[in-house]
Amino acid sequence: MDKSKQLFRKSKRSFRRRLPPIGSGDRIDYRNMSLISRFISEQGKILSRRVNRLTLKQQRLITIAIKQARILSSLPFLNNEKQFERTESIPRPTGPRSRNK
């Protein structure tokens, strides 16, 4: 190959293949809380398929399992944990207000 063609040729980069988030032995079921909890956000929302890196069928099964677990009360619909705790409040003056003009 002459040099002009070698300049435009792209080098093949090696990439590390990611492991699938659900193994072949994992059973997608509403009772498998350790598996289901990996696909729920901190707020309690179901994460998207793009974020989870799941196939369409796996995402559908995960969604159904999460909804069944919510209905059977083994998983909350919302995560109501208080993320922001109030710090000490500054005492307000209780006297009559004065307007500054």
From Swiss-Prot:
Subunit and interaction comment: Part of the 30S ribosomal subunit.
Key words, A-Z: Chloroplast, Plastid, Ribonucleoprotein, Ribosomal protein, RNA-binding, rRNA-binding
Family: Belongs to the bacterial ribosomal protein bS18 family.
Gene name as annotated: rps18
Protein name (database record): Small ribosomal subunit protein bS18c
GO biological process: translation
GO CC annotations, alphabetized: chloroplast; mitochondrial small ribosomal subunit
Database matches in Gene3D superfamilies: Ribosomal protein S18
Subcellular location: Plastid, Chloroplast
Main location: plastid
GO MF annotation terms: small ribosomal subunit rRNA binding; structural constituent of ribosome
Stretches the record annotates as Disordered: 1-23
Bias (Basic residues): 1-19
InterPro entries cross-referenced by the UniProt entry: Ribosomal_bS18 (IPR001648), Ribosomal_bS18_CS (IPR018275), Ribosomal_bS18_sf (IPR036870)
